[in-house]
Amino acid sequence: MDWTWRILFLVAAATSAHSQVQLVQSGAEVKKPGASVKVSCKASGYTFTSYDINWVRQATGQGLEWMGWMNPNSGNTGYAQKFQGRVTMTRNTSISTAYMELSSLRSEDTAVYYCAR
């Protein structure tokens, strides 16, 4: 596979054994530069609308980078300046799922993407 023309998106599931809180994300994706990707994060074990959802990412060998937050109850969002205009965070409360869409992808967007409560 020609990695110079594709962008790899990895996502991870976060769980808490004590409270059975789970955030289960969609699987890995490979996208071409300029494309968009939409990552899902399905919550269970708590009231989805009671806690903000944050999205962060981590590129290989780098630290965590905060992308933004969303209030699942109101739908209000706040995005890191770096991603303004490229990121959109939404939710579907009926299925307790949050979404993060990133557009105009570039090679630097290759990372593991996490949702966090």
Swiss-Prot record:
- A GO CC term attached to the entry: extracellular region
Note down the stretches annotated as region Framework-3.
Answer: 78-115
Q: Where is this region: Complementarity-determining-1?
A: 45-52
Domain Ig-like, residue spans = 20-117
Q: Which parts of this chain are annotated as the region Complementarity-determining-3?
A: 116-117
Supply the SMART domains for this chain: IGv
Q: What PROSITE patterns does this protein's entry cite?
A: IG_LIKE
Indicate the secretion signal residues: 1-19
Q: What biological-process terms (Gene Ontology) are attached? A: immunoglobulin mediated immune response
Which sites does the entry annotate for glycosylation? Answer: N92
Give the residue ranges for region: Complementarity-determining-2: 70-77
Gene Ontology molecular function terms on file = antigen binding
Q: What is its main location?
A: secreted
Q: Which cysteines in this chain are paired by disulphide bridges?
A: C41-C115
Q: What does the UniProt function comment say about this protein?
A: V region of the variable domain of immunoglobulin heavy chains that participates in the antigen recognition. Immunoglobulins, also known as antibodies, are membrane-bound or secreted glycoproteins produced by B lymphocytes. In the recognition phase of humoral immunity, the membrane-bound immunoglobulins serve as receptors which, upon binding of a specific antigen, trigger the clonal expansion and differentiation of B lymphocytes into immunoglobulins-secreting plasma cells.
Quaternary assembly:
Immunoglobulins are composed of two identical heavy chains and two identical light chains; disulfide-linked.
Concerning PANTHER family, the annotation shows: IMMUNOGLOBULIN HEAVY CHAIN
Q: What protein name does the entry list?
A: Immunoglobulin heavy variable 1-8
> What lineage does UniProt assign to this protein's organism?
Eukaryota, Metazoa, Chordata, Craniata, Vertebrata
| The gene coding this protein | IGHV1-8
